[in-house]
Amino acid sequence: MSLSTARSFLSEACYGEQELDANSALMELDKGLRSGKLGEQCEAVVLFPKLFQKYPFPILINSAFLKLADIFRLGNNFLRLCVLKVTQQSEKHLEKILNVDEFVKRVFSVIHSNDPVARAITLRMLGSLASIIPERKNAHHSIRQSLDSHDNVEVEAAIFAAASFSAQSKDFAAGICNKVSEMIQGLDTPVELKLKLIPMLQHMHHDASLASSSRELLQHLVNSYPSTPMVIVSLHTFTQLAASSLIDIPKQLQLLLQYLKDDPRKAVKRLAVNDLKLLAKKAPHLWIRENTQVLCECALTIPYNSLKLGMLAVLATLSGTIAIKQYFSNVGGGSLVPPRLTDLVKLAQECCYHSNLAVAAHGVIVLTNIAISCPEKDIVQLEQDTVLGVESLLMLCSQDSSPSAQATLKTALTSLVKLLKSRPHLSQSAVEFLLGQLHLSCDSSRVLMCHALAAIATHLPVLGDGMLGDLVDLYRVASHSSTDKQQELLVSLATVIFVASQSSLSAEVKTVIKQQLENVANGWTVYRIARQASRMGCHEFSSELYQCVRTRVASEHFYFWLSSLKEFSQAEQCLSHVEDGDYSGAMSAIAEALRSYQKGIASLTAASTPLSPLTFQCEFIKLRIDTLQALSQLICTCNSLKTSPPPAIATTIALTSGNELQRCGRISMQMKVCMDEFRSLAARYADLHQSSFDADYATLRNVELQQQSCLLVSHVIEALILDPQAASFQEYGTVGSVQTESEYERRMMSVFNHVLEEAESLTKKHPPVSHLHTSCLCDAVIALLKVPLSFQRYFFQKLQSTSIKLALSPSPRTPSEPIPVQNTQQLTLKVEGVVQHGSTPGLFRKIQSVCLNVTSVLQSKTGPDYKIPLDTKTNEIKQRVEPHNDYFSTQFLLNFSILGTHTVTVEASVVDESGIEWKTGPKTTVSVKSLEDPYSQQLRHQLQQGGAQPAPQRSTYTRF
């Protein structure tokens, strides 16, 4: 019963667990450990990794590992093996063990057992703990001793432990190196044991002399023992040692290429190819032209497809790095080698038409990378060869639905898109070829081709119109069944149509898509297409799709979610009908859009749950609502120039008051309010951007564009009306040169440039303020409204999930009770934290460090009411810590010299690999009560009694 309870504790994924839950789960597992049945004990042991995953803080982990150490000490070998597996699975939690000495003491006691299997398990356990006990001399001694054992199981365990400690400890590696060398070269050591000892040498890289002696030994082994297993193990260890020490990589490249070229054994060649690929990834800058040339010559002459594929994989890795430029650079100071005459290009061209699809795919990768990075001269023919190679591979694979053909097709399409981004003049013919192949391909190939067409059309929108006719014709006959591939094809084709249409769908296109959706599409497919329509700005169509799918869901939260999306699409659709110069129409459209947005935000709030709070979505929509209200207010303010122009004495008032803004009348004050409002909105967009650590790049760029639009309007208000003399357009001049990644970004950039040009020309020609200035502002508002808002991926889908869990100590006994501390002492606040990831950690950005900000504020004062310096009322400390294995810990010293209750706030933020700080939270608060120390309290009482002493003395004597 206890284990089922523990299982229920560990399987629930609920929010806001109390510490009692962790203790209860540990107690239930402890009952299982103390059970008399071996099965229950084993089940309890294997549940510990889940416990560590759910409650990853040191206090619990320390207690749990001590209990496991007891089981290891007292149990049988099977239980010890279970504990060993748990320890190896929980490697990243080992450093959280607080009582390392006690834990190791209990484990180490088994090393003196008479059972060699028990000793072997203990050695493996010590090896698994090497990261936290790298310099334990008793462990070092036991490992050295066990290497001389006559039991094979114990010796193998000692080799595992020795390898683990060698990787962690320089002293152990230096001490064990000679013994390992003697054993490897000893005649009485079996060959099987030598093969297990040799890989230990890859860890001998702690200093140059150790690495050099290990390399000499490996060189001796390679020359002295030519058998295939020995050569393979020695060469691979050689490569690992070179990759770790870095200084011997050029020599290792020559050695591997020599074996690849001269050794006839296929297994040795395969090992050499794999190691060359490892070094190509590790240090491509160390590959000189001769190395690449030898590899090309081997690939041209090798008769085995598997080895040719491996060599091409190495060349594909190198061709995307600096090594390709070194290959085509000057040779001996002579002229440049013509690219088409080199062996590398010949090999790639030959492989593009190879019968093996994988070989052909790698040939295309190499040829594409060469065409992109090659010098400009002699490139035309190379480009044509690359395009022909890609097209032939596409024709070969597009009608084959096998996994290998689809993988090859994906590689070829990726290379094609990469080439077209670098060489746009090749795009037209490539798009025509893809459209022609679409009609002849199988469904899975069509999906991949649609992805490629969408990428090309996004980069080159001018090609969109030419695609549309073929795509719509294909959509009419695209689906005849409801299989998964057919549904995927409907979504992919619709996405390309949306990209090609550039947010303006014709009635015919809508009819064709809707007809197909009604015939064969399921609800999920309809939702995905609607989502893509919202992303591409086709809001009228997405609104219709959300309307038809929202009644087909089983949860009310999903119903409210779809209802909110429908309202948002309707709101944006209202704004799409705004006409240039129609200011009253713009205000009416904004009012209509705001009504839909208010309905939508109510539904969105109802759709949120504790598991899915929709924080980003709610904040983004609130900002959109406030932005529309600010734009509407700006139009009203511009119109007020007509209803209440500056009075006749405005100039006199301005001269008298010394405020030039008075010359414009009351509109100047209203414009200042508008400018401040837009700057406030820009700051809120910046905060939203800074809190969206898990968002994809397109979503973050979208938020940036919203922020820039607010800053643009505030700048134009200042430049046209408030301060024309000081306004500068220099810093905004390069906004159009930024490389755009989407149609929405392209259109927003175009609007930004147009508005800035109009404002700059008007500032030079006319003094403020006139109807020309207000018309310019209103035109800017309408231009921004006419760009359909894009709802990017993070609004619908969260691909990366990162959260931080904090624990503070000391902690209060109850949540409402403050922590007592004397005012003459400092409180040591320990902050521990765990970084928790979703299924794909680090997809967009990774955490480099965590920034902890601790502040304290005096809430209520209990001491004398005299004036207190401000710096003694608060603490403010900031510290940056780097998490290790997703765990971090640090301490703060806080001073509470003022008597009373203080609120201490600990806020966490993360810093990514680029050094950008993200306000991810969380924020934790704890109350601290500063008490007067007893000695000061006694002195104060004595002083009080001394000041009022005569009267009490008289009364005392009279009573006696």
Please identify what each model-predicted range represents.
Residues M1-Q848, N853-Q859, P864-E882, T890-W918, ...:
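Extended, low-complexity, acidic/polar intrinsically disordered regions
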